[in-house]
Structures are given as C-alpha cells and as structure tokens.
Amino acid sequence: MKKSTRLLWLLSIIVLVAAVSKAVAEVDNDDDDDNTSLEGMTTAKRETLEVEDHTSLEGMVKREALEVKPPKAGKGKGKGKGRGTVAAGPEMNWPGQWELFMKNSGVSAMHAILMPLINKVQFYDATIWRISQIKLPPGVPCHVFDAKKNKVDCWAHSVLVDINTGDIKPLALTTDTWCSSGGLTVNGTLVSTGGFQGGANTARYLSTCENCVWIEYPKALAARRWYSTQATLPDGTFIVVGGRDALNYEYILPEGQNNKKLYDSQLLRQTDDPEENNLYPFVWLNTDGNLFIFANNRSILLSPKTNKVLKEFPQLPGGARNYPGSASSALLPIRLYVQNPAIIPADVLVCGGAKQDAYFRAERLKIYDWALKDCARLNINSAKPVWKTETMPTSRVMSDTVILPNGEILIINGAKRGSSGWHLAKEPNFAPLLYKPNKPLGQRFKELAPSTIPRVYHSIAIALPDGKVLVGGSNTNNGYQFNVEYPTELRIEKFSPPYLDPALANMRPRIVNTATPKQIKYGQMFDVKIELKQQNVAKENVMVTMLAPSFTTHSVSMNMRLLMLGINNVKNVGGDNHQIQAVAPPSGKLAPPGYYLLFAVYNGVPSVGEWIQIV
C-alpha cells in the first residue's frame, strides 16, 4: 500500500472513531428524564466502590478548597423556558460522615416530622405499651387507661427535640398512635391520623410553637386507619388512603368535624394478598393535581375531584413493595421554569422490597429471603409509561428514602434479608446509597460511609435545614426491650452527605434571610440574596429549591417533594453578594400551600435552608 493511501486510510478511521465517540457522549450526557434511548439495556452494572474511613478526617488525602469556574451557558433542555442547563458540579468523592447526636431520645422514633419555624422534630411511637424512657413533665396528669382497675400511664410517648441542641420536651398523648400517618397544614400544624384500637379513628393536631400541646379528636375518621397513608392535596387539605382492613379512602374535614363518607378502592381490594403487602401505600401528588397511588405491585392515577381512576399503570414485577414487603419510594425532584410547559414531567422511584411471601417465610418458617435489589422508575406523565429498572449495590427492605436539597436521593436504613414485622429481618444494611437521578442509567448509585447502628423495623430518616439527615428509631420488639438481638433503639444520629465535605466549604452559599421573603404567592417572581465566596457565579451553576418536610414512618415519607424553581436572573450585587431572581411554583398542584425549606445550591452544594411559606 502506498504511503499516501495508508495516510488517507488512517485519517478516515480517525474521523470515524471521533464521530462515533461524539455520538456516544451525546447519548450519555442526555437529560435522562425519559430514558427512551436506554430501553433494552441489560441490568445496570454495579459499581465497585471503596468507602473511606468515616470516623475522622485524619489520614485522608489533603484536598484544597475548590474554586470552580462556571462553564459556558447551555441552551437548556425540555420545553420550559428560563431555566437553562444546570451545570454538574465537581464529582464528590467524600463518602459522608456519621455523628452521634443523642444517646437517648426518650421515645423510640417510630414516626418523625420536622416542625416548621421552631426547628424541632416531633418523634412519637405507640401508647399501647404504656412505657418509654421519659416521664411526663411535672404538672401534666397521668393518663387513666383503665378506670376500673385504676391503671394509669405516666410515660410520655411523644417528644419535641431541638435539632441543634438535642433538648427534649415530652408531650402527653392519650390515643394510640401506633402505625399512624401525618402531614402539615398550611400554617404548619401537624395533623396525625389513625393508629391502633381507640386511636384508629382519631385525628390529632399539634401546632408549631414552643408550648403547644396535642389536641385529639377520637371520632374524626369514618374508617379505622392503621397502617394508612396521608397525602396533601393542592388546596392544602388531606386524603387518607388504606390501612389494615380499610380498603378505601377518605378526606379529612376541618378540625373538630367528623367525617362519615368513604370511597371504595378497587386498587386496594385487588392488591390485598395473603400477606397484605398493600399497607402504607405510596401516594404522590402528581404535577397535574391528581394522585399517583401505588399498592403492592400495581398503581393508578386517581382524581381527588371526581374520585375516578384516570389511568392504570403497568405492573411492577419482582415482588411486594408495600408493608410488610416495604420498599421505599420518592417523587423525584420536579424541575420548573420561568415559563413552564403544559405537561410538567414527574417521575416516581420505588426501590427494594421483598418477595411476595417473605413475611410468611420469615414468620412461620424462620427463612429470611434476600430482599429485592432493584430500583424502578416510572415517568407517570408519559403517554406510554414503562417501569425502567436498575440494580442497587445491595439488597434492601425497610429502607427510608430522603430527597436532599440538591436534588439527589439518599436511600438509607433497612435490612438485606426478610421483611417488615417483629423480628422478621436479618443483616442490617448499614451503608446508605446516594442516587443521582440525572446520571445515565447504570451510573446513578454510589455507596456511602456505613453507620454502626442497626436501623431495621420502625426506623426513620428526615432531611434537616443544615443539609444533614437525621436518622433514628429501630424497634423490632413488641415493647421496649434491650437484651435482644436488635434492641429498642433510642440513639439518634446525623449523617452528612458528600456535599458537606469540608473541602467544599467555600462553595456553600449562605442565604441572607433579611433580604429573602418569608412568604410568597404562586407564580411570584422573588429575590433570594446569597453570600458566596466564588467568582463569576452564573445562572447555570445555581439552583433554588423548595423542600417540603416529610412525615416519615414504616419506610414511607409522606408528602416529601422537592421543587427546582425557575431562575430568571443571577447577578452580583457587590463583593461576595449575589441576587438570584427565582419564580415560585405556579399552583398548588406543584406545591401545596404551606411551609417549605428554601435552599440556594451552587454546583451541588446547598446552603442552610430557610423557612418560606407559599400561599
């Protein structure tokens, strides 16, 4: 072959390889909301991840504080306008860090929610055991639960815990809250529904103030609600779905009124198998104002206005996903724009769970099967929705899913074998998983630093304003027991995700709360002023997010949602001060009225959240 011919041939090969590489890169970097280009792929490859020693920073490679230059502005994807492409920040390799926050929370944290404004978390468990590790305060009378035998309960079963100091305030509860549900009203009042025995028809109210007490209405609900799910509607009212022997749903009336009307649910009837596997269903408010309801392995879209089923989704194969199968779920972050498209995408994530008969095999045969290892995702507003699954690094049942303020998802707690229930799980799963929704399929999971405390049945995890995650609970015993395989757990931990790496400290914005509104209206354009020690802060590097506090129990994070707001402009207003012009969600379909934590995020690193109310 002549030299000129060989040279021409080599040049042709180089051009061809470059073209193919470019095409592959474009596919890999595509916004993977729909994943249509990834259909037919084999099960995602598991990453082999080395987790650093999380007990201290000594011995770690010294990392200089990062000064990140913003990339050039992108045109943005999707049909919305005024959002742009959010630049991917630096890859965060720090595995996170655990700290022991409290040695004794007083009550085991079966249920948890962050109360707005006062920055205290409400923990409560069950009253049926008539025991906890903290007494009612002086001046609060003991509860007489058996007048004939003069039996009284002087223990507290509800506590308010200061998330910064760990100070505990015990509160009195009289109705049984065991396996109940909850959510926040527009003004931040906690409404707790259902429970056990005399508490099953109860609605309880706890306002968000330092000296507030529980107010209980034992006949507020039409059906007995035990293991039910409560969801917030676009107008700020509530629906309660399901529960043991309650194959129906109802709407909560204003405080002090008793509901009498029930609506039958064919979904719950059709998914009620011999092991149940449809308790604590997943209920997510879709971006169109309708409700996505998932029970066992099936799901529907329900109109809360007409009470008609609008759509049935494909079945999710592989096993059971609701109690006692107990997967965990999230409505993935909702991306908004200055001008939003007519249909705003919404993806639901369901991760882990158990085999259909796992409960029976664990309880009757003492065989603890491996939990499910898959994580499935569904675009519920797609014309042809299809579950798209990938494999987690480890099996997991009874996990908790937490949306982080930067839009990433933390999957934490649970076990590798068995199911929910008393003593029915083995091999606690100590290592959290970080799920990055916008990464390509097969690259979304990263295993983080493990805890040393088992968090199995009756555990919780919730996001905090400082970006940490509060982790507590774990009681697989029928009562408070401490000399067993998995003792009743009273220790509370905090987990710092990778974005709290000390090396990223100078990338963390600080919201100037005196220059940021405390209340906004739907569709309002408003300013968020931040301090940030970075140069050339561009719109493509910044997000403003709103995170709704979730009511968390039994692997269900009720009403958890994060909105990525449309950003109109970002400008420097002197020195390290920057002003972000953001647009509030357009309606209660996207963000039900009430309190949210407002975060500014720079290259994946969030500020401390500030409370904001949307009305």
From Swiss-Prot:
It is an enzyme of class 1 (oxidoreductase). It holds the Pfam family Glyoxal_oxid_N. Residues 1-25 form the signal peptide. It catalyses: an aldehyde + O2 + H2O = a carboxylate + H2O2 + H(+). Residues 72-82 have a biased composition (Basic residues). Glycans are attached at N35, N187, N297. Disulfide bonds: none annotated. The keyword Kinase does not apply. The keyword Signal applies. It comes from the Eukaryota. Residues 70-89 are annotated as: Disordered. One of its GO terms (cellular component) is extracellular region. GO terms for molecular function: aldehyde oxidase activity. InterPro entries: Gal_Oxase/kelch_b-propeller (IPR011043), Gal_Oxidase_central_sf (IPR037293), Glyoxal_oxidase_N (IPR009880), GO-like_E_set (IPR015202), Ig-like_fold (IPR013783), Ig_E-set (IPR014756). Transmembrane segments: none annotated. Keywords: Developmental protein, Glycoprotein, Oxidoreductase, Secreted, Signal. It is found in: Secreted. Its EC number is 1.2.3.1. Catalyzes the oxidation of aldehydes to the corresponding carboxylate by coupling the reaction to the reduction of dioxygen to hydrogen peroxide. Substrates include glyoxal and other aldehydes. May be regulated by the transcription factor MYB80 during anther development and play a role in tapetum and pollen development. This is Aldehyde oxidase GLOX1. It comes from Arabidopsis thaliana.
